[in-house]
C-alpha cells in the first residue's frame, strides 16, 4: 500500500483515541477550556453517564462568530502561537485538538457569545464529514458545548464503555479534582436532571473549609496539616494528612502543578519517602498539594492526556517536596498535650520550645534522640524525632521501620489520644474554643474573632481583651531560638546560599563561630564569601539573603554576645509569617505561647494584652 495522507475525519478519530478515552475525558477537556476562558461559574449536565449527553455551560469570555468554525478545526488554538509559548505553557489546553477529536466521535454543538457581540452564534458538527454549520442563536455571554451520542460512529469504542453508574463515577472524580484546583470557580454537576454536586465559589477561609470538606470529607479536615513552603521559583502549599489520618483515609491523593491536575510518579515518590516507615507498604499518604513552578522549568507536553509532566530539575523538585513534607510531619505530633502534671516536671529556667504542636519534647533546642533508648520513652513523644531518611526501595529504611514498629506498640494508651484535637487547620467550632485550654493550666482565654489586621479578641472569664498577635509571635520566636546547653539543631538547606561579605562581617563570622554553631547556623567563610548550609527550623521560611548579612553586621559591632541576647535580636528582626491573621492561626499561636511561655500568661508584658473597657459602652446603652 502506498503512503498517503489520512483524511481529516480519520486523523481526528485517531487523535480521539488518545484524548477521548471515556465520557470523563470529554468533561475534563471541556471544563479546562472553560477555565482557560476565565469562567467563574460552570454548569455540567450529564445524561446516562455521558453516553447520551454532556453539556458544559460557562460564563467565560466566549468565542467570536468568525472563530467558531475554526474552533472545531484540528490544531487550531488561541492559547499558543510560537515555540516559546510551547516551552512555557500557562494555560490548561494548548494543542487545539480536543474539540476536533470530540466532534469526530459525537454530534457536537457549540453556542457562544462574546461581550462585543449583540447576538450569539451556534456551530454544529458531527463525525461523518466534519462539516461545520454556523447560525444565529440566543445565549448570554459565555459558551455552551453539547456533546450528543458519544462514540455513535465508533461501535467498538462504545461497546467498551462501562455501566452508567461507573461512567458517572469517573466524571464525578474529574469534577472533584477540578473543584479542588479552582476554589474561586462555582461548579454544579447534574446527572439525569438531578443536581448531584454543588461547589460554591470560596472567598474566605470558612468557605474554603466547607469546600475542602465537601470534597475530601470531614475526616481529612480533622487530620490535615497545613503546608506552605517556598524556595526560589518553587512553591508548595496545601494539606497533608498526619500518619494516623493517612492510615484511616486510604488513598486520597490530589496533586496539582501550576493548577494542572497531575498524577506524577516523582511527586508521589517524594511524598511517600517523607512519611518513611510511618505507613505500611500497602498504605498510601493522603494529601492535597499545589506545586507552583516556573513554566520554563516544566514540560507539560509529554503525555497525551497531560496527566504527567517532566521537570527540568527533577532532583531539585523531588528534594524540595520531600523536605517540605518532612518538616511539616516533624512539626506536628500524633497526640495533644496530656492533661496531667507532666508539663510541671519540665525544667523552666530556659523556655523549651518545640517544633510541633501539642506533643512532647523540644526539637528546636534538643539534639537528635538516641535510637537505642527510644523504646523506653513515650511513643508519642519520639515518633517524629528520627532524621529524614532517603531510600528509593520499597521498604523506606527497614531498620527505621523496625524502630517505628516498636514505638507504635510500646504505649497502647497512645491510641485514644489520636482522636483528640490536633494542630488546628480547619477545626470545628468546638475545637477552636477548647484548643487554647488544652495545652496548659494557664490560658489567655478563648479566641472569639480577629480584629484586622493582627489583633485577637479574647474572652477570659467575664472580661474581654485584645491580644497583639505579632508581639506574641515575637515572644514565641524568642523562646524557640533561645538554645539550651546542647544548642539548636541545624536543618540543612536544600541549596546552600552564598553571600558576599565585607571584611568586618567576615571577621565577625569567624570570631563568633561558636555562638553561630550554638544557634544552629552552619556558616563557612572562604575568601570574603560565606556559604550558609544550615539554619534552625524557625529560620527556614525567612529571607536568609537579607537576614544573615544583617546578623553578621550586628555581630561585627559586638565582641561578646550571649545566645539569649542574640535570640532577642532574631525575634525582633524576623518577618511575620502572616500578613492577614485568621482565627485558626491565632489559636495555634496562643497554644504555642501558653505551652512554651507560661510567664507571658501570668505577667503579660507591655504591648501584648489590652483589656477592653465595656463599661463605657454599657453606660452609653443604658443612657439611650
Swiss-Prot record:
Gene3D superfamilies according to UniProt: 3.30.230.10, Histidine kinase-like ATPase, C-terminal domain, MutL, C-terminal domain, dimerisation subdomain, MutL, C-terminal domain, regulatory subdomain
Top-level taxonomic group: Bacteria
Gene Ontology molecular functions: ATP binding; ATP hydrolysis activity; ATP-dependent DNA damage sensor activity; mismatched DNA binding
BP terms from Gene Ontology: mismatch repair
Biased composition (Basic and acidic residues): 369-385
GO cellular component: mismatch repair complex
Keyword Acetylation applies: no
Region (Disordered): 360-396
Family, per entry: Belongs to the DNA mismatch repair MutL/HexB family.
Name the record gives this protein: DNA mismatch repair protein MutL
Organism of provenance: Serratia proteamaculans (strain 568)
Lineage: Bacteria, Pseudomonadati, Pseudomonadota, Gammaproteobacteria, Enterobacterales
Gene this chain is encoded by: mutL
Amino acid at each position: 500500500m502506498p503512503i498517503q495522507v489520512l483524511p481529516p475525519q480519520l486523523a481526528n478519530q485517531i487523535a480521539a483515541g488518545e484524548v477521548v478515552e471515556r465520557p470523563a475525558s470529554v468533561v475534563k477537556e471541556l471544563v479546562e477550556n472553560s477555565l482557560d476562558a476565565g469562567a467563574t461559574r460552570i454548569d455540567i449536565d450529564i445524561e446516562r453517564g455521558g453516553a447520551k449527553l454532556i453539556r458544559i455551560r460557562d460564563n467565560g469570555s466566549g468565542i467570536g462568530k468568525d472563530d467558531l468554525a475554526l474552533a472545531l478545526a484540528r490544531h487550531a488554538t488561541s492559547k499558543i502561537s510560537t515555540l516559546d509559548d510551547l516551552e512555557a505553557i500557562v494555560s490548561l489546553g494548548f494543542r487545539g485538538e480536543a474539540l476536533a477529536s470530540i466532534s469526530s466521535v459525537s454530534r457536537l454543538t457549540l453556542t457562544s457569545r462574546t461581550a462585543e457581540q449583540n447576538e450569539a452564534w451556534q456551530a454544529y458538527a458531527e463525525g461523518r464529514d466534519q462539516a461545520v454549520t454556523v447560525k444565529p442563536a440566543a445565549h448570554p455571554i459565555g459558551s455552551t458545548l453539547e456533546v450528543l451520542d458519544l462514540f455513535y460512529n465508533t461501535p467498538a469504542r462504545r461497546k467498551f464503555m462501562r455501566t452508567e453508574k461507573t461512567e458517572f463515577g469517573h466524571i464525578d472524580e474529574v469534577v472533584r479534582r477540578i473543584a479542588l484546583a479552582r476554589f474561586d470557580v462555582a461548579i454544579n454537576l447534574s446527572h439525569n436532571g438531578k443536581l448531584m454536586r454543588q461547589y460554591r465559589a470560596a472567598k474566605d477561609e470558612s468557605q474554603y473549609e466547607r469546600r475542602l470538606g465537601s470534597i475530601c470529607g470531614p475526616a481529612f479536615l480533622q487530620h490535615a496539616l497545613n503546608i506552605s513552603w517556598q524556595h526560589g521559583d518553587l512553591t508548595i502549599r496545601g494539606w497533608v494528612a498526619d500518619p494516623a489520618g493517612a492510615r484511616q483515609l486510604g488513598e486520597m491523593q490530589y496533586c496539582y502543578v501550576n493548577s494542572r491536575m497531575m498524577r506524577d510518579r516523582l511527586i508521589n515518590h517524594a511524598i511517600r519517602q517523607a512519611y518513611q516507615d510511618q505507613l505500611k507498604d500497602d498504605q498510601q499518604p493522603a494529601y492535597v498539594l499545589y506545586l507552583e513552578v516556573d513554566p520554563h522549568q516544566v514540560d507539560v507536553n509529554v503525555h497525551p492526556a497531560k496527566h504527567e509532566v517532566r521537570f527540568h530539575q527533577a532532583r531539585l523538585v523531588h528534594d524540595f517536596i520531600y523536605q517540605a513534607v518532612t518538616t511539616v510531619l516533624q512539626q506536628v505530633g500524633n497526640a495533644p498535650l496530656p492533661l496531667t502534671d507532666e508539663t510541671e516536671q519540665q525544667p523552666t529556667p530556659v523556655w523549651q520550645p518545640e517544633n510541633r504542636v501539642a506533643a512532647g519534647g523540644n526539637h528546636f533546642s534538643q539534639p537528635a534522640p538516641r535510637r537505642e533508648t527510644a523504646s523506653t520513652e513515650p511513643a508519642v513523644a519520639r515518633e517524629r524525632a528520627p532524621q529524614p531518611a532517603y531510600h528509593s526501595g520499597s521498604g523506606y529504611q527497614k531498620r527505621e521501620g523496625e524502630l517505628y514498629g516498636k514505638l507504635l506498640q510500646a504505649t497502647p494508651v497512645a491510641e485514644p489520644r489520636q482522636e483528640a484535637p490536633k494542630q488546628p487547620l480547619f477545626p470545628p467550632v468546638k475545637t477552636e474554643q477548647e484548643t487554647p485550654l488544652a495545652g496548659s493550666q494557664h490560658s489567655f482565654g478563648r479566641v472569639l474573632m480577629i480584629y484586622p489586621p493582627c489583633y485577637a479578641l479574647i474572652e477570659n472569664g467575664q472580661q474581654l481583651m485584645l491580644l497583639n498577635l505579632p508581639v506574641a509571635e515575637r515572644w514565641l520566636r524568642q523562646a524557640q531560638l533561645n538554645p539550651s546547653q546542647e544548642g539548636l539543631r541545624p536543618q540543612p538547606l536544600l541549596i546552600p546560599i552564598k553571600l558576599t561579605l565585607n571584611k568586618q562581617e567576615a571577621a565577625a563570622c569567624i570570631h563568633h563561630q561558636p555562638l553561630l554553631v550554638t544557634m544552629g547556623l552552619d556558616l563557612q567563610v572562604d575568601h570574603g564569601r560565606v556559604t550558609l548550609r544550615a539554619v534552625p527550623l524557625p529560620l527556614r521560611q525567612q529571607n536568609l539573603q537579607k537576614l544573615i548579612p544583617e546578623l553578621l553586621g550586628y555581630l561585627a559591632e559586638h565582641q561578646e554576645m550571649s545566645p539569649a541576647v542574640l535570640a532577642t535580636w532574631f525575634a525582633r528582626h524576623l518577618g511575620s509569617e502572616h500578613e492577614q491573621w485568621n482565627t485558626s492561626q491565632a489559636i495555634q499561636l496562643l497554644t504555642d505561647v501558653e505551652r512554651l511561655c507560661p510567664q507571658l500568661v501570668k505577667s503579660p508584658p507591655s504591648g501584648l494584652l489590652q483589656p477592653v473597657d465595656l463599661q463605657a459602652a454599657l453606660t452609653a446603652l443604658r443612657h439611650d
